[in-house]
C-alpha cells in the first residue's frame, strides 16, 4: 500500500492490495510513520498530558483514570459514541473487580483504536478501464486541491491520468482545476461554466477510454450538504459513470476537513444517504488537534480512510496506514 502511486504491471494488478514484506516495504512504512508522527503532533499533544499522567509508571488503573481518558478522547473528537465503544469493555472489567495495569490499559487502547479503523477491501486504483475516482465533499474541504495532488502523485508513478471538471457551478472551479492541471502536468477535461455536470462526466469518460487514459479523477460541486438538488445531481453522475465503468471499477471518495471535527460526521451522513461512499480522505490533519475524527468516521460508517493530508505539497498527501496512525498519537 505504501507504493500505491506506482503503476503496476498487468501481471501484478491482482496483488495491489497485498504489500510485499520486503526491506523496501519496511523502510517505506518507517518513513510513513515518521511523517505521521510529525504531522499529527497537535492531536498527540491533545492526548499527551492526560495519558502521560496515567502511563508514567506501571500501576493499577482506577475508574477516575478512565474518566480522564474518556474526556481527553472526546475532546480529540473521537466522539461520545466511538469513545464509549472503545472504553466500555475496560470499564466493565474494572467494575467486575479485575485488576488492569497502566501497561495493559495502553495495549488495550492501542488494540481498540486499531480495531476502530476499517481496512480497505479492494485495491486503489481499482480494476476499471479506466480506473475512476469520483470525489465528493462540501466546499472548502480541499477537494479540488486533493484531486490535483493525487493526480500528480499517480502521474509521477507512471499512470496516464485525466482530471474531469465536474464542478460546473462554483465560480472559478473549472479555472482552478485547469491551473492545477498546468501546475502538475495532468490534462483536464472541462466544458463551460454552468454545463450539465453529468454531460461533462460522460464526455470526459468517453475521452479517457478512446485516448487510453488509465486513471480518471472527477471533481464535483460542493455546495452545502443540506441542498437536496446537489444530492440528486450526484446520483445522476454516478449513473453516468456506470454506463462506462462497472461498480467494482470506480470508487466514490468523500473528502472531509479534519478541522471540522464532529461536523464532518453530519456531512458524511448526508452524502451517505444519497449515494454509496466507498472511502474517505481527511484533509488538513496537520493543523488540528481533532485527529480523533478519523476513528469516529471509520467506525461509524465502516469506511476505510484512503489518504490524509499533512501539508500543502502533493507529497504531503499520504496513504493512510492505521498502524502508523495509532502509533503516532499513542506511542509505545
Segments from the language model and where they lie:
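P-loop/Walker A NTP-binding module and the surrounding RecA-like catalytic core of P-loop NTPases
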Residues: 114-116, 122-332
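Non-catalytic terminal/linker segments enriched in charged/polar, low-complexity residues
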Residues: 1-122, 128-134, 156, 161
Amino acid at each position: 500500500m505504501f507504493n500505491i502511486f506506482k503503476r503496476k504491471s498487468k501481471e501484478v494488478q491482482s496483488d495491489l492490495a497485498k504489500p510485499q514484506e520486503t526491506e523496501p516495504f519496511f523502510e517505506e512504512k518507517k518513513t510513513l510513520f515518521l511523517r505521521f508522527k510529525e504531522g499529527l503532533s497537535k492531536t498527540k499533544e491533545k492526548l499527551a498530558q492526560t495519558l502521560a499522567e496515567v502511563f508514567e509508571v506501571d500501576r493499577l488503573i482506577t475508574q477516575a483514570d478512565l474518566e480522564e481518558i474518556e474526556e481527553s478522547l472526546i475532546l480529540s473528537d473521537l466522539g461520545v459514541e466511538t469513545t464509549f465503544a472503545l472504553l466500555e469493555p475496560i470499564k466493565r472489567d474494572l467494575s467486575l473487580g479485575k485488576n488492569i495495569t497502566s501497561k495493559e490499559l495502553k495495549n488495550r487502547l492501542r488494540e481498540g483504536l486499531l480495531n476502530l479503523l476499517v481496512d480497505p477491501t479492494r485495491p486503489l486504483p481499482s480494476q476499471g478501464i479506466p480506473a475512476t475516482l469520483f470525489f465528493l465533499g462540501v466546499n472548502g474541504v480541499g477537494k479540488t486541491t486533493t484531486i490535483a495532488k493525487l493526480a500528480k502523485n499517480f502521474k509521477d508513478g507512471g499512470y496516464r491520468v485525466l482530471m474531469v471538471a465536474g464542478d460546473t457551478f462554483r465560480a472559478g472551479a473549472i479555472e482552478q482545476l485547469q491551473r492545477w492541471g498546468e501546475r502538475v502536468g495532468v490534462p483536464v477535461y472541462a466544458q463551460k461554466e454552468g454545463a450539465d455536470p453529468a454531460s461533462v462526466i460522460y464526455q470526459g469518460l468517453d475521452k479517457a477510454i478512446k485516448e487510453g487514459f488509465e486513471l480518471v479523477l472527477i471533481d464535483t460541486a460542493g455546495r452545502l450538504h443540506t441542498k437536496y438538488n446537489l444530492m440528486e445531481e450526484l446520483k445522476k453522475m454516478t449513473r453516468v459513470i456506470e454506463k462506462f465503468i462497472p461498480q467494482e471499477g470506480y470508487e466514490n471518495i468523500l473528502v472531509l476537513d479534519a478541522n471540522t471535527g464532529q461536523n464532518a460526521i453530519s456531512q458524511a451522513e448526508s452524502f451517505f444517504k444519497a449515494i454509496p461512499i466507498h472511502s474517505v480522505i481527511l484533509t488538513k490533519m496537520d493543523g488540528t488537534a481533532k485527529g480523533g475524527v478519523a476513528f469516529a468516521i471509520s467506525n461509524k460508517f465502516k469506511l476505510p480512510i484512503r489518504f490524509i493530508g499533512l501539508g500543502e505539497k502533493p507529497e504531503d498527501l499520504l496513504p493512510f496506514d492505521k498502524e502508523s496512525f495509532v502509533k503516532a498519537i499513542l506511542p509505545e
